[in-house]
A protein has these predicted regions:
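Membrane-helix interface/capping residues of multi-pass secondary transporters
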Residues: 29, 38-41, 153, 182, ...
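Transmembrane helix-bundle signature of multi-pass secondary active exporters and lipid flippases
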Residues: 14-63, 67, 133-137, 224-290, ...
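Hydrophobic transmembrane alpha-helices of multi-pass small-molecule transporters
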Residues: 53-56, 167-171, 197-201, 271-275, ...
Length: 430
């Protein structure tokens, strides 16, 4: 199979898989909006940064270790087999604080994220359940990354889609027929990665599998080597959490809970958009790492060009749909028919999503830099878009233009980051 055909196979399957992952957040938002109105949407939006942090750690461990595994395997290095076990063991270590927070102080965490008394009372049960399942969220990222890098992207896609379908169906069953309310939504979300892991585990029993669990203690050295390549994935996932937290605080100050609920609509569709572009980056990663391990620089550059072109085309298609159907798209999560929320979300969608013309390229380029063992440059791109530029732009533009400035901060920060990314890519070629 040609490199181009392999690229489209890996990328398309990974996009579908990650879309499935984002769909269970959308399912939560829809059913919670039906059950609890704008307060429920505001609660979920306050919880999104916690999800992002959990996924960011899973991404750093999973993508970092799997990328290191793919490079070493292409070079015929037997040390590659130790990275899978090490990543799983460290996931359990990193998950422990989240589990303890879920057991002893979920209300403290919700207050820290900006929740008022109403939101905290509404969300304690929801937060407690999903925090207790943190190890499964993290391990799901690791298992799927290794299955994909071991040549089975189809199984990784099927596992993710099955987990997401379970979540959507049981969100409804747990919340309404069984009457569990918001804790039911959390339970459906929490169990879905367990199912995904179980399906992915079939790969490890195949004769073709080169990934296996090795009995060992957690190795800080292997962790550092993995995180070196996974830190861009960590920052990339965290960027959504940082953006959400900063925007929530600014919007609470500007217009209160209704504005946060409006941003909840924008943020949930942004999860889907980001999943699409992460699908391009993560789908190409095994192929780029393989080319790099075999010293095939031309093949790696070809994959970068394919990824960048794909990202631009997808950004144009995405914005055309969102611009053409903004009203109905906003109405999906506006069960109380709040005119003010609809007004805020309408302008938010149309301004915010302009940023994906730049964000798609930035995500693909950061994934490429990590896949070819250029972690410092990958981290610079991810840190710019995830923390430095977005925080600076949101503070400055919100002070100048109010709520529209908050929405415009995302496209402005991504445009700045795209300039930095182009500089980093060209500098290496000289």
């Amino acid at each position: 199979m040609s490199l181009t055909k392999q690229y489209f196979k890996y990328v398309s399957q990974n996009i579908f898989g990650l879309l499935g992952t984002s769909c269970y957040i959308l399912a939560d938002t829809y059913f919670i909006s039906q059950a609890s109105g704008t307060s429920g949407v505001a609660l979920l939006n306050l919880c999104l940064p916690i999800y992002n942090f959990i996924f960011a750690i899973g991404s750093m461990l999973g993508l970092g270790a799997a990328t290191r595994y793919a490079i070493l395997r292409a070079q015929g290095d037997e040390r590659s087999e130790r990275y899978f076990s090490n990543a799983l063991l460290w996931a359990l270590v990193f998950a422990l604080p989240f589990m303890l927070a879920g057991i002893f102080c979920p209300e403290v965490l919700l207050r820290f994220m900006g929740g008022d008394a109403e939101i905290v009372a509404l969300g304690v049960g929801y937060a407690r359940i999903f925090l207790l399942f943190t190890p499964f969220f993290m391990c799901n990222y690791i298992v799927s990354a290794f299955v994909r890098n071991d040549g089975d992207p189809s199984l990784a896609m099927v596992a993710t889609l099955c987990g997401s379908l379970f979540n959507v169906v049981f969100d409804y069953i747990f919340m309404f027929p069984m009457g569990l309310g918001l804790p039911g939504a959390a339970l459906a979300t929490a169990v879905s990665p367990v199912l995904s892991i179980a399906i992915c585990s079939r790969h490890f029993f195949k004769k073709s599998s080169t990934v296996r669990f090795v009995r060992q203690l957690p190795s800080p050295k292997l962790l550092a080597q993995s995180c070196q390549l996974g830190v861009s994935g960590f920052v990339g996932e965290m960027s959504s959490g940082v953006t959400t937290t900063v925007f929530n605080l600014l919007l609470l100050r500007l217009a209160g809970n209704v504005a946060v609920a409006a941003y909840g609509v924008v943020a949930n569709y942004a999860l889907v958009a980001t999943a699409i572009f992460n699908g391009v980056a993560q789908g190409a990663q095994p192929l780029v790492s393989r080319c790099y391990g075999k010293n095939d620089a031309a093949g790696a550059r070809k994959l970068l060009l394919l990824g960048s072109g794909t990202a631009l085309a997808l950004a144009a298609a995405l914005y055309a749909v969102l611009f053409g159907f903004t009203g109905p798209i906003v109405a999906v999560f506006n069960s109380e028919n709040s005119a003010l929320m609809a007004q805020y979300a309408f302008s938010g969608v149309r301004i915010y999503f302009l940023g994906y013309f730049f964000a798609g390229f930035n995500i693909v380029a950061a994934g490429y830099l990590g896949a070819v063992d250029r972690p410092a440059e990958a981290s610079a791109t991810s840190l710019s878009r995830g923390i430095v530029a977005i925080v600076a732009c949101s503070l400055v533009l919100s002070a100048l233009f109010g709520m529209n400035g908050v929405w415009a901060a995302f496209p402005a920060s991504e445009a700045i980051t795209a300039c930095l990314t182009l500089f980093l890519l060209k500098r290496k070629k000289r």
